[in-house]
């Protein structure tokens, strides 16, 4: 169960996501990584700006957190993401030894365009991972996070859809 502290950090992740704007077509994801009660990274999705297909909010935050700490491992850190991490970001969390992942909106809360892999559930990645010391929890400020994105039943033409 998420705590008031989790909600505080998730609200910060929402603010980071909103710094990209309010258009759900731009995939305004936000991510905050907290260690020992302090933010060590706060990033948003930057795939279009860089351009870099791996510049998801979680990937950027993990990079910044490792730079800030000077470490490859983020043991004891909690990663807060406004959207359920994709497979790439989930595996990066595992490999960087993040201790806990807390996300807001899940796959079923948003349009399928936000998830490239239609049959791969990141929760399955966690469950089958070689690490058993990572925790994952979804639904923290779910509704507020889901408002950032197109809804699951949004009628979008192909030109409007993109996995960003």
Stretch-by-stretch model annotation:
Residues 28-37:
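Short beta-strand scaffold segments in enzyme catalytic cores
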């Amino acid at each position: 169960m998420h705590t008031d502290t989790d909600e505080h950090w998730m609200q910060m992740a929402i603010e980071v996501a909103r710094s990209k704007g309010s258009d759900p077509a731009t995939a305004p994801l936000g991510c905050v990584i907290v260690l020992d009660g302090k933010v060590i990274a706060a990033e948003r999705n930057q795939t279009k700006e860089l351009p870099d297909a791996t510049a998801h909010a979680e990937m950027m935050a993990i990079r910044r957190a490792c730079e800030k700490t000077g470490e490859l491992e983020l043991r004891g850190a909690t990663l807060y993401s406004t959207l359920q991490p994709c497979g790439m970001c989930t595996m990066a969390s595992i490999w960087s030894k993040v201790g806990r992942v807390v996300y807001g909106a899940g796959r079923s809360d948003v349009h399928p365009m936000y998830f490239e892999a239609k049959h791969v559930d990141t929760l399955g990645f966690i469950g089958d991972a070689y690490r058993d010391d990572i925790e994952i929890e979804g639904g923290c400020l779910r509704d507020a996070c889901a408002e950032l994105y197109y809804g699951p039943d949004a009628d979008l033409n192909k030109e409007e859809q993109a996995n960003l």
